[in-house]
Regions:
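Transmembrane beta-strands of outer-membrane beta-barrel pores
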Residues: 34-40, 84-90, 133, 154-160, ...
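Residue-level detector of the transmembrane beta-barrel scaffold of outer-membrane proteins
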Residues: 29-33, 79-81, 128, 149-151, ...
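Outer membrane beta-barrel transmembrane domains
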Residues: 43-45, 52, 211-313
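Outer-membrane pore/translocation modules
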Residues: 89-203, 208-215, 313
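Short loop/turn motifs that connect adjacent beta-strands in outer-membrane beta-barrel proteins
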Residues: 18-27, 77, 135-147, 195, ...
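Hydrophobic, lipid-facing positions within transmembrane beta-strands of outer-membrane proteins
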Residues: 28-30, 64-68, 123-129, 148, ...
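Short sequence motifs at beta-strands and strand-loop junctions characteristic
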Residues: 58-63, 116-123, 142, 177-181, ...
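Surface-exposed strand-loop-strand hairpins of Gram-negative outer-membrane beta-barrel proteins
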Residues: 37-65, 166, 173
Length: 313
């Protein structure tokens, strides 16, 4: 499976979801977010699968994240964001694949009777601090406004990592934690004209080696989203559509590049944020429209994100 940047970093766009278009900008907040990602495929070629009478749909991976996130303004132009997920990853295969491969070491899930493995636990914490480089606000509410924020971050190894020196490289990508400190850099630019606007985000993560000599590949995410503001009394709705692009270099294990790792994917994003006084509800659906993966990997079928947050001074 291609290990791209953690989705919980980007679902919030490292600025309390859609920073710059939400009415809670420059206010402290805390919230919960749920992510669901569905994959299909395995580290076998199409020819190998065909020989066994199988296809990639006989193999699945489901990733779920339950994320607690917060943002805090210690001073006017500095925003600190923190994110801590609980991760539940499940991979498995159909009975047909289990019989064809002679798998006996997988557990049997009694609900769907598919061989599976489960990896769960607290994930790695992410801390990011962004500084407001500029904020040009039009005196006319119907005019043009824009701003730029940028700053560093760090991914802290708080997550569970259940591997050993003999583990296969692909097992690291399923773990809740990576076991290494990974520096980051983040940038966001927001522009608005009347009730319409756009946002451009970019985040870079540098992979570092853990004690098992595994290092995730360096990763970058760039996304562009357009939105429109709609108001009814105390309610505010921001529907949005955009494109998310993610790219990752190959992982490194014992100083060797991992063949079935890294690559790039592009997602179509459709979402909406609903605000009522101090509360915000978000939902988004992301569908892959382009992929270029190295080797043989499970492919993402879709991503679903929902969340609820509360704002306070």
């Amino acid at each position: 499976m291609v290990l791209l940047l953690p989705s919980y970093i980007f679902a919030c766009d490292f600025c309390n979801c859609y920073v710059g278009l939400n009415p809670h900008y420059k206010k402290n907040s805390i919230g919960f977010r749920y992510h669901y990602m569905a994959y299909s495929g395995t580290e076998m070629s199409a020819a190998e699968l065909k020989e066994l009478g199988l296809n990639k749909k006989d193999f699945f991976e489901n990733e779920m994240e339950y994320e607690l996130h917060a943002q805090y303004y210690p001073v006017q132009k500095l925003q600190i964001m923190a994110s801590l997920p609980y991760i539940y990853n499940r991979d498995g295969m159909s009975n047909k694949a289990k019989a064809a491969l002679g798998i006996t070491h997988h557990d049997m899930h009694q609900e769907d009777m598919k061989a599976e493995n489960v990896y769960e636990g607290i994930g790695d914490m992410t801390l990011i601090g962004v500084y407001q480089v500029f904020n040009k606000i039009s005196m006319d509410s119907a005019g043009f406004s824009h701003r730029l924020l940028a700053g560093p971050g760090i991914k802290i190894p708080t997550g569970k990592l259940s591997v050993n020196e003999m583990s296969e490289a692909h097992l690291f990508t399923h773990q809740p934690g990576m076991g290494s400190w990974n520096p980051m850099a983040a940038m966001t630019y927001i522009a608005r004209y009347q009730k319409a606007g756009a946002r451009l985000n970019a985040v870079y993560l540098a992979g570092t080696e853990n004690k098992f000599e595994f290092a995730p590949g360096n990763k970058v995410n760039v996304n562009f989203t357009g939105y429109y503001e709609m108001k009814w009394s105390k309610w505010q709705l921001y529907p949005s559509v955009g494109v998310y692009w993610e790219s990752a270099a190959k992982d490194i294990y014992y100083s060797e590049k991992v063949a079935n790792s890294g690559g790039s994917m592009t997602y179509l994003h459709i979402g909406s944020d609903l605000y009522y006084q101090k509360f915000a509800l978000e939902a988004a659906f992301q569908l892959p429209v382009q992929k270029q993966l190295n080797g043989y990997q499970a492919e993402n079928n879709f991503r679903l994100i929902t969340g609820l947050s509360y704002t306070f001074n």
